[in-house]
A protein has these predicted regions:
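Short acidic (Asp/Glu) patches
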Residues: 52-64, 78-101, 117-123
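Extreme N-terminus nucleophile/cap motif
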Residues: 1-58, 254-258, 263-269
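Conserved beta-strand-loop-short alpha-helix elements that form
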Residues: 2, 103-113
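Catalytic core of PPM/PP2C metal-dependent serine/threonine phosphatase domains
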Residues: 73, 150-193
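Glycine-rich phosphate/ribose-binding loops and adjacent secondary-structure elements
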Residues: 111, 182, 254
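A conserved acidic, glycine/proline-rich C-terminal tail/linker
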Residues: 205-255
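Glycine-rich phosphate-binding loop plus the immediately following alpha-helix
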Residues: 114-115, 124-147
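Helix-loop elements that line ligand-binding/catalytic pockets
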Residues: 185-216
């Protein structure tokens, strides 16, 4: 299965060796060598980097580690192709505009019957590639699009969270459906199941989180603001597997989080 990574923080920071740590899960005999992507939010827009080469051999990965933009919200992805050819159209994270903001989505799992599922309707959004992940993103966006909102504004947090949870519940019935979804304001996280490397079984946990309160910076993040801002920094990292020896917390199957600027602001348990 694919590898997921996300960072949410109060003040702009750089992922530094988080990129290398994520790429380490795509080297050697790993199956995850079918492409990678990184998204760095800059306000309502996003700087998106994707490639179809293995992350551990692509020269762009260490370049981004040293020169990538500082941000308060970032998503990362390494692909193991279960559906669709190895090409850019099938490589996440996927990005679309909605409500005047770039929306970004990355998924870990295999939704085998998604395209044939009658309740699934992606509406006016259509995937560019052939993956289940891109189709899942389109149907989520179509549901978000229908929520009440003022022109150019986001729907309420509760409405968005409820919709993310409803879509996650529908996807889980079709297969493992862990995903990261960001709308420039909030990072939504759904933890499901994944194939465990030691047992080969598809079980939880599929995601881990690392919470670093004010004044404690994680090893994989470098603060890019003043020393005063660094003392008030607050960071949450999400990853498919623990990337350091720090106190990563396994997420429960069916757990949905809404995270803003390094703080969990809402939760749902499916």
């Amino acid at each position: 299965m694919c590898e997921l990574l996300a960072m949410s923080c109060r003040h702009p920071a750089r992922l530094t060796s988080s990129l290398t740590a994520l790429a380490a899960h795509a080297d050697g005999d790993s199956r995850n060598r079918d492409g990678w992507g990184l998204a760095f939010y800059q306000g309502r827009d996003v700087a998106l980097y994707r490639d179809t080469t293995p992350a551990d051999t692509c020269p762009l990965v260490p370049w981004l580690e040293a020169n990538g933009p500082a941000t308060t919200l970032s998503l990362g992805y390494i692909r193991h192709a279960t559906q669709g050819a190895i090409n850019l159209a099938n490589t996440g994270p996927f990005a679309r505009e909605l409500n005047g903001r770039m929306q970004v989505f990355a998924h870990n799992g295999n939704l085998k019957n998604l395209v044939h599922s009658s309740p699934i309707n992606s509406g006016c959004f259509q995937p560019v590639g052939e993956t289940d992940s891109a189709l899942a993103f389109c149907l989520l966006l179509d549901r978000i699009r229908q929520l009440p909102h003022a022109r150019g504004q986001l729907p309420s947090l509760q409405a968005r969270l409820d919709t993310v949870a409803e879509v996650a519940l529908a996807l889980r019935a079709l297969g493992p459906a862990s995903f990261l979804y960001a709308d420039s304001d909030v990072l939504f996280v759904h933890a499901d199941r994944r194939r465990q490397p030691l047992t080969g079984q598809v079980t939880a946990p599929a995601l881990y989180r690392l919470e670093c309160p004010a004044g404690r910076e994680p090893l994989l993040v470098r603060d890019c603001e003043s020393e005063e801002a660094a003392t008030a920094q607050r960071v949450i990292l999400l990853a498919s597997v623990p990337l350091t020896q720090e106190a990563w917390i396994p997420m429960r199957e069916g757990e949905v989080l809404a995270i803003r600027q390094g703080e969990i602001i809402a939760t749902v348990q499916l």
